[in-house]
Amino acid sequence: MPMQEPQRRLLGPFNSTRTGAPHLELSANQTGPWCLHVSIPDGLFLSLGLVSLVENVLVVISIAKNQNLHSPMYYFICCLALSDLLVSVSIVLETTLILVLEAGALATRVTVVQQLDNVIDVLICASMVSSLCFLGAIAVDRYISIFYALRYHSIVTLPRARWAIVAIWVASISSSTLFVAYYNHTAVLLCLVTFFLATLALMVVLYVHMLARAHQHAQAIAQLHKRQHLVHQGFRLKGAATLTILLGIFFLCWGPFFLYLTLIVLCPKHPTCGCFFKNLNLFLALIIFNSIVDPLIYAFRSQELRMTLKEVLLCSW
């Protein structure tokens, strides 16, 4: 677990302080006086992680409690919340260990710390890969519901959804283990960045197609003035809007980190890139922020889930 600022935290395999990783610590005269470095306190990381942990636990409990939410769409949303939960647990665990080690309250071997760091790295990487996969799965689910509405329930069945979920988790954990084991290979970074861009491209294409179809239907419905169809189409538009918001926030929160990985390969010692590298902790804080925002979007966009969340909160009191 790297212990030096500014890049001492998560995803140690991509951290400049790890042995064998690209040397990214540039001095002030290499980056220039114009270089902006945003420092993120440990307390902020711990607070963000705890907030995200509580929110995503509530989402998982709400979906598990309400039988009306036991559908493929909400199963994928639940797994997305579990991915965010992995981020939260990892953040809280690592920040706590850092504080304990820095305070000298825990004396342990370097090899033990390294093993703990590897476990945290696998958790974070698995959550990253699984988040992308489940966002893609949600987009595909919505696409089928709009363009193959009559066949939707025969195409997207619960058994198929469960098998897809199992496959995604197995693939995410397996690939993350390999990524951490071979962290000092440039191919690892390129694979992660390529997977991120490919998944985003797929989702953008699906969303653009869905929004185009929704716009055509809205125009036709406006001419017919049939309220029943309008309500049904409004439901679909609401779902597409929710997923678009999720995708946009995911891109804004994860984009800087993937740009960071890309620049490690392209310009590891360039002054401008070095300035960007100094803000790794900021990019990681954005990732945690993404895991906080996701449950809020579910609660405000889904009336059924919002009502269940209220019931869960009232029961907890």
Swiss-Prot record:
Q: What is this protein called?
A: Melanocyte-stimulating hormone receptor
Return the SMART domains for the record: 7TM_GPCR_Srsx (SM01381)
Query: Which residues are the lipid attachment points (S-palmitoyl cysteine)?
Result: C315
Where do transmembrane segments lie in this chain?
38-63, 73-93, 119-140, 164-183, 192-211, 241-266, 280-300
Q: Quick one: which gene encodes this? A: MC1R
The primary site where this protein sits is membrane
Q: What does this protein do?
A: Receptor for MSH (alpha, beta and gamma) and ACTH. The activity of this receptor is mediated by G proteins which activate adenylate cyclase. Mediates melanogenesis, the production of eumelanin (black/brown) and phaeomelanin (red/yellow), via regulation of cAMP signaling in melanocytes.
Can you supply one Gene Ontology CC term for this chain's record? plasma membrane
Subcellular localization(s) per the UniProt record: Cell membrane
State the similarity comment. Answer: Belongs to the G-protein coupled receptor 1 family.
Q: Which region is the signal sequence?
A: none
What keywords does the record list, in alphabetical order?
Answer: Cell membrane, G-protein coupled receptor, Glycoprotein, Lipoprotein, Membrane, Palmitate, Receptor, Transducer, Transmembrane, Transmembrane helix
- Could you tell me which InterPro entries the record lists for this protein? GPCR_Rhodpsn (IPR000276), GPCR_Rhodpsn_7TM (IPR017452), Melcrt_ACTH_rcpt (IPR001671), MSH_rcpt (IPR000761)
Tell me which residues are glycosylated: N15, N29
* One of the record's GO molecular function terms: melanocyte-stimulating hormone receptor activity
